[in-house]
Regions:
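Cationic, low-complexity basic patches in intrinsically disordered or flexible, solvent-exposed regions
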Residues: 9, 20, 39
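Acidic, low-complexity central loop/insert segments
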Residues: 82, 103, 110-240, 292-346
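N-terminal, positively charged, Ser/Thr/Ala/Gly-biased leader segments
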Residues: 45-62
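Intrinsically disordered, low-complexity proline-rich regions
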Residues: 16, 23-26, 31-34
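Short, positively charged and aromatic/hydrophobic N-terminal segments
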Residues: 26, 38-41
Length: 348
């Protein structure tokens, strides 16, 4: 028996065996159905809250947008992947329920194409969402809030610092210890982005670096080369990526988009992921390790900028700890603002 109550968008499927005389079956069936519809109509439909936040910015509609789904325990990996495609952001975060007062949360990150082990701007957005919904709170004495996010490949530490006035709290993410991967031939890589060897900073190697997610690092000569870059052959990028050791390419140069910045970057993707990411936290961590390790920056603390030419200006604070040859930690910091709140139907 199927019934639809269109006035409240309630869909009911009833599978039961009723053994009654034919003369009474219709009456009992309709009575049962009316009662069931009234019962369901009076019950609130369970829903999963979600938020859309902009990370690495203090202003809405800047930085990098991220969807965060809360209370996501019951969602299967397949459903999470479908929802990530539905939201169609560079990443979507799924946060499981935690006991009240807990500072540890199970979190997973999905792009429209796949699950990934670590991501920067979803981490910032996730913590901002937890603060906004009251699941965590800053200590009353003004000390930082320390959280643990249990990700696909293990836990990471997040420190939340109160800020002065109405500015959102500053979220610091400690990424994995850097791993320096393969060196790539410029003649194989640069044509994919419409570039030539002259567009590289002289002496700079093209290298895979991971602080949780392996990214291909390309240090270009200047802003002009960076702005000239584009994915000239998406299929070639997809083939090269599939045969290599990196998730996505990160192109950058020294000198910020504004006077306060020290680096400027762009980050490209392959379908069904978005074509260009506005502000990429995980790759910024890998970039920081690359720059410090190879001696391209004098200070381990700097400001990274990205997204300005897309109308999505974002700012990432960066801290690298340890000597150039043995980096101990890489941290990225940023703020996030809530743009949208809503709910998902629980039967997904």
């Amino acid at each position: 028996m199927n019934a639809k109550a269109s006035s409240k968008s309630i869909f009911i499927q009833v599978n039961t065996k009723i053994q009654l005389a034919p003369s009474r079956l219709r009456f009992v069936g309709l009575s049962f159905l009316r009662g069931l519809i009234q019962y369901v109509a009076l019950r609130p439909m369970p829903q999963l809250p979600f938020l859309l936040l902009d990370a690495f910015t203090t202003q809405p509609l800047r930085g990098n947008p991220c969807a965060v789904v809360l209370d996501a325990d019951a969602l299967t990996p397949a459903t999470r992947q479908q929802l990530a495609r539905e939201f169609n952001q560079s990443e979507t975060a799924f946060v499981n329920r935690a006991t009240p007062g807990s500072t540890e949360f199970v979190v997973r990150f999905f792009t429209p194409a796949e699950e990934i082990p670590l991501a920067g701007h979803p981490t910032i957005a996730t913590v901002a969402a937890l603060l906004h919904t009251g699941q965590v709170a800053l200590p009353a004495d003004g000390t930082p809030l320390v959280l643990t996010l249990d990700l696909l490949h293990g836990p990471i530490r997040v420190d939340v610092q109160p800020t002065i006035g109405s500015e959102p709290p500053l979220v610091w993410m400690t990424q994995r210890r850097p791993v320096f991967g393969a060196i790539h031939a410029p003649e194989d890589v640069l044509p994919i982005f419409g570039l030539t060897p002259d567009d590289l900073l002289p002496g700079a190697s093209i290298q895979t670096v991971s602080t949780g997610t392996p990214q291909l690092m390309l240090l270009l000569r200047d802003h002009a080369a960076l702005r000239r870059a584009y994915v000239a052959d998406p299929e070639a990028l997809g083939r090269y990526r599939a045969a290599s050791d990196f998730f996505s390419p990160h192109l950058f140069c020294l000198g910020g988009a504004t006077p306060t910045g020290h680096t400027f970057a762009r980050h490209f993707g392959t379908p069904p992921d978005i074509s260009e990411d506005p502000v990429t936290g995980s790759a910024t961590g890998g970039m920081a390790a690359y720059l410090w390790h190879h001696g391209y920056i004098n200070s381990p603390n700097f400001i990274a900028e990205q997204g300005h030419d897309m109308g999505r200006a974002g700012t990432v604070q960066v801290r690298v700890s340890g000597p150039r040859t043995a980096i101990e930690t890489v941290q990225i910091g940023g703020t996030a603002v809530v743009v949208l709140e809503g709910s998902l139907r629980a039967e997904l």
